[in-house]
């Protein structure tokens, strides 16, 4: 009897694990996004966009130049810009494939501040520059590595991580791959100080051991006031 119960529990856990994968598997070879349907008023929000007729698919649906264009991150709050591929805008052939790519431009001394991707793991490859990367796990252990051009690093799914251009004279460029077409991004500073509506000041004061004036100052510096 106990063996039968244990078997049912293990089977249930196995099925649950399958259902909790990042993105669902395709039932076809590909599902090129119908970008017209994606922008239509009242369009449904799905894990992936509606597909066009496979007979209408073209090679350029599976190609993009979106990541070839450099951006100027110098004027941004943290000195970084991230360009993410999107089935609706730049890479319709990636629809429902469970992946996205990103180009991160880092100004000299710029940083992608501590953040997480709740729905994806990330593999980051440095194309140019010297970039200090790292993540903290759920036991608050920190893993860091200084990467140079041609070197890569993996950020496990949902772990808080950062990328910091150590060079104060030259920019850096990083190319990332993520195993979800909708990885999400949650910046830690904004999650604490830029929510709408705002977190209560008392919560922030107690959590960070700061004063009410500190809360106001940080919110102002983050452009939240």
Swiss-Prot record:
Cupin type-1 domain ranges (all copies): 65-216
SMART domains given in the database record: Cupin_1
Compartments where located: Secreted, Extracellular space, Apoplast
Recorded superkingdom: Eukaryota
GO MF terms held by the record: manganese ion binding
Annotated glycan sites: 81
UniProt keyword terms in alphabetical order: Apoplast, Disulfide bond, Glycoprotein, Manganese, Metal-binding, Secreted, Signal
Disulfide bond positions: 31-51
Keyword Manganese recorded: yes
Keyword Secreted: yes
Signal peptide residues on this chain, from the entry's feature table: 1-22
GO cellular component, one term: apoplast
Binding of Mn(2+), residues: 115, 117, 122, 161
Primary location: secreted
PANTHER family from the UniProt entry: GERMIN-LIKE PROTEIN SUBFAMILY 3 MEMBER 3
The family this protein is said to belong to: Belongs to the germin family.
Subunit structure: Oligomer (believed to be a pentamer but probably hexamer).
Function of the protein: May play a role in plant defense. Probably has no oxalate oxidase activity even if the active site is conserved.
Protein name (Swiss-Prot/TrEMBL): Germin-like protein 3-1
Species in which this protein is naturally found: Oryza sativa subsp. japonica (Rice)
């Amino acid at each position: 009897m106990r063996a039968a119960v244990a078997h049912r529990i293990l089977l249930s856990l196995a099925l649950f694990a399958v259902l909790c994968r990042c993105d669902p598997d395709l039932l076809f070879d590909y599902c090129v996004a119908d970008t017209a349907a994606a922008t239509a008023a009242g369009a449904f929000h799905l894990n992936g966009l509606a597909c066009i007729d496979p007979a209408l698919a073209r090679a350029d649906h599976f190609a993009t130049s979106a990541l070839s264009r450099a951006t100027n991150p110098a004027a941004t709050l943290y000195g970084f810009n991230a360009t993410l591929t999107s089935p609706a805008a730049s890479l319709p052939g990636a629809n429902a494939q469970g992946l996205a790519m990103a180009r991160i431009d880092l100004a000299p001394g710029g940083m992608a501040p501590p953040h997480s991707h709740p729905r994806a793991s990330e593999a980051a490859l440095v194309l140019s520059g010297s970039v200090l990367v790292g993540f903290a796990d759920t036991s608050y252990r920190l893993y860091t590595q200084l990467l140079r051009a041609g070197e890569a690093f993996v950020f496990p799914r949902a772990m808080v991580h950062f990328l910091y251009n150590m060079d104060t004279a030259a920019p850096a460029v990083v190319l990332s791959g993520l195993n979800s077409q909708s990885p999400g991004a949650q910046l830690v500073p904004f999650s604490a100080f830029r929510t709408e509506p705002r977190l209560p000041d008392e919560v922030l004061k107690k959590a960070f051991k700061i004063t009410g004036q500190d809360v106001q100052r940080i919110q102002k510096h983050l452009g939240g006031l």
